[in-house]
Regions:
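Acidic/polar surface patches and capping/hinge elements
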Residues: 27-442
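Generic cytosolic/nucleocytoplasmic N-terminal low-complexity/intrinsically disordered segments
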Residues: 2, 24-26
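Bacterial N-terminal signal peptides that target proteins for export
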Residues: 1-9
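C-terminal segment of classical bacterial N-terminal signal peptides
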Residues: 16-23
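Repetitive helical segments and hydrophobic/amphipathic motifs
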Residues: 12-13
Length: 442
């Protein structure tokens, strides 16, 4: 159960002359179902989408936050602050954390921008100049006046409450030393960098919604002497080799695309496109991104709980090992993966988990899996086309085999865990009152 914070007495009373002029924007009663869909007719995305895009931008700047803090935490805190600020004014759903008494006539767009700015300034202090400059751009779009001033003040107070709630969640603790165990199946530091194991303390972070990091812990991976392991070993050895002759050009493009940007950023880009295409209202967008990024953050916590419970080796270690642990696998000491291997255990697979969680959220929110979209990464000059959320998720899953990063059992486990985490998050949060997105109020 999420303990909500009460902000009592934050709603200011507007002057009567402004009240009559702004009556169309009054906070609707919670039993009403209608939400105005003004975004589709607008020439630019609303502030929720614009700040989600800014979040993606500043989060990937090298050194923007400590390497030990998982980026999905920053995304979730920011989007929860935006959601609670917007919902507090429009009253179209249950708050996630802050039991809000929002100013009835305040601008929800100003509140969204202010909440995002406040959260990001605190979480990414090195990026404050860029964040504050973007905030001024937002205000130029929104306008000025008492409604905007109230929205700005309210968004700041809500975000500050969310930040205070997460200040002692364990994310700031230093990375835990991980000393690899010897023997077949055990994770070893991966070449070429042989960097220390990463995100070792993420499983100790307090989840946003899950009851514990191990609530949906993955089952043990297949035994090294099993037929499944041998089959998955052979698949990655063939398709994931750096100079593979069995991997097609399209499969190489898939591996290149999904390895070129953080997968949680890619799925926020998908959500941006879908939000525009489906004509979401501002409150729907606030709910969408809060549900998406909270699911991704709790997926990260669950993922690393499983990774460091089993500390299973990566293909680069398994395939080049002298002792394979299975008479039906044939190693190759000269084998290299198509892409350099991440510095954490292989099981479960992160791309599969995050992608399954994200696609589950998007299917649930929009009520359909069908959505045609394109994703381009100009850094590697690759564009991928999709006709469904699940199609993109499946491709992200396969990409890590083509890249030589994972075995199929890693990916299958990640998919199952991501689906379960997202389902739990959406079943227990973000209830709404008749408009689009997740589960209606019961």
């Amino acid at each position: 159960m999420i303990k909500r914070i009460a902000l009592v007495g934050t709603a200011a009373v507007m002057a009567m002359s402004l009240a009559m002029a702004a009556i169309a924007n009054a906070r609707p009663a919670r039993h009403r179902h209608h939400v105005a869909r003004t975004h589709a007719a607008s020439t630019q995305p609303d502030q929720v989408i614009q700040w989600n895009e800014e979040l993606q931008k500043v989060l990937v700047v090298p050194g923007a936050q400590p390497a030990s803090i998982h980026p999905t935490r920053t995304m979730a805190i920011t989007q929860i602050a935006v959601y609670d600020a917007v919902t507090g004014i429009l009253g179209q759903g249950e708050p996630f954390l802050v039991d809000i008494r929002g100013p009835r006539f305040a601008s929800p767009e100003a509140a969204a921008a202010s909440a995002a700015r406040t959260a990001l300034d605190a979480l990414l202090p090195s990026q404050q100049p860029a964040i504050d400059a973007f905030f001024q751009t937002s205000l130029a779009q929104i306008g000025s006046g008492p409604r905007v001033d109230q929205g700005v003040a309210y968004g700041q107070r809500v975000a500050s409450a969310v930040l205070a709630n997460r200040a002692s969640d364990g994310a700031a603790q230093p990375a835990l030393a991980f000393i690899p165990f010897p023997g077949p199946g055990e994770y070893q530091l991966t070449p070429p960098a042989l960097a220390p194991a990463g995100f070792t303390q993420v499983a100790n972070v307090t989840p946003f919604v899950l009851r514990s990091a191990g609530q949906f812990r993955a089952p043990a991976p297949p035994a090294l002497d099993s037929a499944q392991y041998a089959a998955d070993f052979s698949q990655t050895k063939s398709l994931g080799e750096k100079t593979s002759t069995t991997r097609t050009a399209d499969e190489t493009a898939i591996a290149t695309f999904w390895g070129a940007a953080p997968v949680w950023v890619v799925w926020n880009q998908v959500a941006d496109q879908a939000a525009v295409a489906f004509g979401n209202s501002v409150v729907e967008n606030a709910r969408l991104f809060a549900g998406l990024d909270t699911s991704l953050a709790d997926s990260a916590i669950a993922l690393y709980d499983s990774k460091y419970t089993y500390h299973r080796w990566r293909p680069i270690t398994a395939i080049t090992a002298t002792d394979q642990g299975n008479p039906n696998t044939v190693g190759d000491p000269n084998w290299l993966p198509f892409a350099n291997t991440a510095n954490d255990p292989g099981y479960p697979g992160a791309h599969a988990e995050f992608s399954q969680a994200a696609s589950s959220v998007l299917r649930d929110f929009f009520g359909t899996d069908r959505f045609s979209f394109a994703l381009t990464n100009p850094t590697v000059n690759v564009t991928r086309m999709f006709t469904s959320f699940s199609g993109a998720s499946d491709e992200a899953n396969a990409s890590r085999i083509f890249a030589g990063q994972h075995f199929q059992y890693d990916e299958s486990s990640g998919q199952r865990q991501g689906s379960r985490v997202a389902g739990f998050v959406l079943d227990h949060t973000f209830e709404h009152f008749g408009d689009r997105g997740f589960h209606p109020h019961r």
